[in-house]
């Protein structure tokens, strides 16, 4: 019987990690990468895992969620983390890398691996057999059409327009109230009421806030029905007051009166630990977002776990179509990995590739599927993309402590809480490793 070869499409961070995990387990891999045959608007080299934005893989401390994620991956022999450690440059508490050395390490490792066959070509259809699609946010039109045919017409998004997401524990609950507009249905929103003076201060700050630059390949019409709130503000005060900050039907139960303006917060996860700021999709720089958001009553000291973004980002509606192993539901042979699955960030993308790669290897070796515990950062990300209860408006997410189950005992001090969650994650990981 011919040996099974797994196709990994895309040699970014997720695809490179998936290919490595497969190859290290004795599985033959066709790693299919269209560069340099066809370049993307964002890439400049023919190397694998090219970092197209920042050279930072973010925080390295275990009081930082992505730091915990990196440590979990380090303990699972992640190629991406090995490369990052080898190519590290000074960056304080962050793990930053020399881009050239980082990509070179990964490229050389995979090209010299006896189980990896590199194929440089653009494909417009999904290969037959076991396949991991890891083509990233700039997936070509032909392949995107094929993915739509397989997943369903409403399951592939081309623009990431997400409002900021915050931790519930950091909201000043004395200043907000639970209510749905006109009391329809259950009280599902936390409402931050504003006086006219507070609104004016907020409005002026929005007008003065600095927007992020837009890449050429992102300049498309994604504002229809999803306009950045700072663009609404530029059209005049009333645009916000008749839009996302409309107070009608949201009387404050403490006063019985209608506030001048209201910012609504909507639960974003099943556990109720994360909330998004309704209608606040934005192009503002992250520092500007924090300053503006902290002018909202009740959010003066809020912890933002995911800033608002609007950019080109091809991703699927994962809660409807993917399992926790990153496998397409109802299709034993097809897996996805990387930003396309709804994980956000370099490290998160690589982690999804690690999970997908291990699972395909286990399937071919007749071993049990690998579902990481939710207490781990790897497991919490896999659970989020497959179970998010906002599947009608699913948006990508990066690693954060709001995704893992709460500790049994509530700890008010944030640093201590994060340390305990980190220790728990690594304990669970070590125990889980014994089953791999």
Swiss-Prot record:
Biological-process GO terms, alphabetical: tRNA methylation; tRNA wobble uridine modification
Gene Ontology CC terms: cytosol
Sequence positions that bind FAD: 10-15
PROSITE patterns in UniProt: GIDA_2
Catalytic activity from the UniProt record: uridine(54) in tRNA + (6R)-5,10-methylene-5,6,7,8-tetrahydrofolate + NADH + H(+) = 5-methyluridine(54) in tRNA + (6S)-5,6,7,8-tetrahydrofolate + NAD(+); uridine(54) in tRNA + (6R)-5,10-methylene-5,6,7,8-tetrahydrofolate + NADPH + H(+) = 5-methyluridine(54) in tRNA + (6S)-5,6,7,8-tetrahydrofolate + NADP(+)
Keyword line: Cytoplasm, FAD, Flavoprotein, Methyltransferase, NAD, NADP, Transferase, tRNA processing
Cofactor field: FAD
Keyword Glycosyltransferase attached: no
Keyword tRNA processing appears in the UniProt entry: yes
InterPro entries assigned to the protein according to its UniProt record, in alphabetical order: FAD/NAD-bd_sf, MnmG-rel, MnmG-rel_CS, MnmG_N, TrmFO
EC class name: transferase
Database matches in Pfam families: GIDA
Alphabetized GO MF terms: flavin adenine dinucleotide binding; tRNA (uracil(54)-C5)-methyltransferase activity, 5,10-methylenetetrahydrofolate-dependent
Location within or outside the cell: Cytoplasm
The enzyme's E.C. designation: 2.1.1.74
PANTHER family recorded: GLUCOSE INHIBITED DIVISION PROTEIN A, METHYLENETETRAHYDROFOLATE--TRNA-(URACIL-5-)-METHYLTRANSFERASE TRMFO
Purpose of the protein: Catalyzes the folate-dependent formation of 5-methyl-uridine at position 54 (M-5-U54) in all tRNAs.
Family statement drawn from the similarity comment of this UniProt entry: Belongs to the MnmG family. TrmFO subfamily.
NCBIfam families on file: gid_trmFO (TIGR00137), PRK05335.1 (NF003739)
Protein name: Methylenetetrahydrofolate--tRNA-(uracil-5-)-methyltransferase TrmFO
Origin species: Staphylococcus carnosus (strain TM300)
Taxon lineage: Bacteria, Bacillati, Bacillota, Bacilli, Bacillales
